[in-house]
């Protein structure tokens, strides 16, 4: 018996849970099987990709949101034969610019000083549509 569903793997960003895909799931057609994944807390993007890849379908479309885009590219690098298509959302396909690197370093500093929740809340308005709140 062949699998008639199309598999779409959804990888959220570093501060996201699988909830980030809830609204999308509500409007997805019945022939689309969603596989929502959360990035495990590992130090290396390739290690994160390896852990996630272990439990994914044989063939699938892949969507990475924010940091999940970097993880998706790492999955693509080792399992191109399994990926039918790639979607990068609110991410990029290369290294951070110097300005982005400075922003990330400042964000890490704020988070390490106890400002994590404020940092995440401050970014929500620029990342998500107001109807998603």
What are these regions (language model features)?
Residues 62-64, 89:
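Short beta-strand immediately N-terminal to the catalytic nucleophile in serine-hydrolase-like folds
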Residues 4, 56-58, 81:
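Active-site acidic short loop of glycosyltransferases
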Residues 44-46, 92-99, 130-131:
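A short beta-to-alpha transition loop/helix N-cap that caps and shapes the active-site region
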Residues 77-78, 82-120:
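Flexible "cap/lid" loop of the alpha/beta hydrolase fold
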Residues 23, 74-78:
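Active-site signature of alpha/beta-hydrolase-fold catalytic machinery across serine-
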Residues 2-46, 50-51:
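Conserved HGGG/HGGXW glycine-rich cap/lid loop of the alpha/beta-hydrolase fold
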Residues 64-68, 72:
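Gly/Ala-rich beta-loop-alpha elbow adjacent to hydrolase catalytic centers
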């Amino acid at each position: 018996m062949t699998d008639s569903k199309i598999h779409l793997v959804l990888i959220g960003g570093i501060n996201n849970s699988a909830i980030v895909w809830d609204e999308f799931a509500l409007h997805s057609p019945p022939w689309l099987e969603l596989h929502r994944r959360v990035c495990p807390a590992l130090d290396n993007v390739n290690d994160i990709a390896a852990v996630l890849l272990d439990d994914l379908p044989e063939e699938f479309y892949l969507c990475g949101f924010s940091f999940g885009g970097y993880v998706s590219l790492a999955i693509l690098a080792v399992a191109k034969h399994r990926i039918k298509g790639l979607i990068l959302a609110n991410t990029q396909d290369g290294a951070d610019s110097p300005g982005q690197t400075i922003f990330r370093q400042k964000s890490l500093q704020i988070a390490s000083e106890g400002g994590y929740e404020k940092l995440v809340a401050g970014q929500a308005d620029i990342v998500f549509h107001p109807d998603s709140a």
